Amino acid sequence: MAQKIRKSTFKKDKNSSINGVVHIQSTFNNTIVTITNITGDTISWASAGSSGFKGARKGTPFAAQTAAEKAALDALSKGMKSVEVLVKGQGSGRETAIRSIEGAGFEVTSIQDITPVPHNGCRPPKRRRV
């Protein structure tokens, strides 16, 4: 019986743009960094959990820095040069994630805070007593 001859196909990179948007979602438990092009297609992403941190260490500023560097290096290798940064959430890793994006070699054009603020929506969780 004749065997099929397989052609080796490689995944073709989409036309990567030079400009992009860095979305940083920083919660108290984790930090997620997603880098997209202008139309919103994801180019690279990383989180504190995907960078090797587990448990309570995912919420630390160092974990956010590591995740941002990992996503930034991946996007830089695909040809991205300048980005605008959108930050959402009030976690401890937002400032260090922004600094590591700038330090990775991106030209940051703008930084915006898009944290959602409720207009008296859901009841917030009760205060912690330690």
Swiss-Prot record:
Major localization class: plastid
Keyword rRNA-binding among UniProt keywords: yes
Keyword Ribonucleoprotein appears in the UniProt entry: yes
Entry keywords, A to Z: Chloroplast, Plastid, Ribonucleoprotein, Ribosomal protein, RNA-binding, rRNA-binding
Molecular-function GO term, any one: rRNA binding
Family matches, as InterPro entries: Ribosomal_uS11 (IPR001971), Ribosomal_uS11_bac-type (IPR019981), Ribosomal_uS11_CS (IPR018102), Ribosomal_uS11_sf (IPR036967)
GO biological process, alphabetically ordered: translation
Pfam families in the cross-refs: Ribosomal_S11
Compartment list: Plastid, Chloroplast
GO cellular component: chloroplast; ribonucleoprotein complex; ribosome
Self-association and partners: Part of the 30S ribosomal subunit.
Family: Belongs to the universal ribosomal protein uS11 family.
Record protein name field: Small ribosomal subunit protein uS11c
Taxonomic classification: Eukaryota, Sar, Stramenopiles, Ochrophyta, Bacillariophyta
